[in-house]
């Protein structure tokens, strides 16, 4: 079969490939083909799941023989208007490419004041951060073959959502990376639970994120819980959705107690609110 290329347009005009933007239709996250969003691409029916790749990373494929969907995490730095290629491999067929367009989304900006040494790092702190960043980059590229129990998530702690995903952040008036998670305001010690069933992939105390726990839900679908005051699970533990895994704290680079909650698909941080039921 010849190699084929399709265009996956915004959901309103590409019914043949895009899942309609219904809230959590069929147990899938809300589609949002924007930087930091999720593209849900219809791969059609076949007996076994096809293999999909995006930006060199394996992509989560969900569904069953009656219909498969690629659930693609779109990086925050994706270029608006670009047609990004999703490579799909099916048994006994040549690979095909499905391209989907990236729409525009405007994210707010935020000014934060922190200790000067948390912005201009000392040589020792910079070396520590670079080592931790390399470690976490490898962790966040994890792709395990087990399918997630669910693609819908619980809010992991009680409290108002205080800072949204994607904000362009300035620390002491200096630009830094966009906010790659959702912040939930809560007092120190508030219980934090697993947003979904998964395996504890990584536990650490990092310069910026403080005490941090990462859950692997399967097939490149990960959640991260940061700035914890305490962690109540160990690497390798299997934890069900809703089980306590730690407590809200103010560790790492923070201005006060809160939970920083991130969701990753195919190593890209995506908006957690697309998954919270």
Residue spans of the language-model regions?
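Surface-exposed, glycine-biased beta-strand/turn segments
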Residues: 99-209
């Amino acid at each position: 079969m010849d190699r084929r290329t399709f265009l996956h347009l915004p959901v309103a005009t590409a019914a043949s490939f895009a899942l309609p933007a219904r809230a959590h239709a069929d147990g899938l996250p809300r589609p949002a083909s924007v930087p930091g969003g999720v593209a849900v691409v219809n791969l059609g029916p076949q007996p076994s799941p096809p293999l999909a790749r995006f930006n060199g990373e394996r992509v989560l494929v969900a569904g069953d023989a009656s219909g498969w969907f690629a659930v693609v995490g779109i990086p925050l730095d994706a270029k608006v208007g670009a047609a990004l290629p999703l490579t799909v491999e099916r048994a006994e067929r040549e690979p095909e490419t499905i391209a989907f367009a990236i729409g525009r989304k405007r994210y707010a900006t935020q000014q934060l004041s922190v200790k000067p040494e948390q912005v201009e790092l000392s040589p020792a702190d910079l070396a520590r951060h670079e080592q931790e960043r390399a470690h976490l980059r490898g962790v966040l590229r994890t792709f395990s073959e087990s399918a997630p129990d669910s693609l819908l998530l619980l809010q992991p702690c009680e409290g108002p959502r205080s800072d949204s995903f994607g904000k362009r952040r300035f620390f002491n008036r200096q630009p830094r990376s966009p906010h790659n998670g959702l912040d939930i305001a809560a007092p120190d010690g508030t219980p934090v639970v697993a947003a979904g069933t998964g395996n504890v992939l990584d536990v650490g105390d990092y310069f910026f994120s403080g005490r941090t726990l990462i859950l692997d839900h399967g097939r490149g679908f990960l959640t991260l819980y940061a700035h914890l005051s305490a962690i109540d699970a160990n690497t390798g533990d299997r934890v069900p959705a809703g089980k306590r895994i730690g407590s809200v704290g103010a560790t790492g680079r923070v201005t006060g107690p809160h939970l920083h909650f991130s969701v990753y698909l195919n190593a890209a941080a995506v908006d957690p609110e697309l998954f919270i039921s």
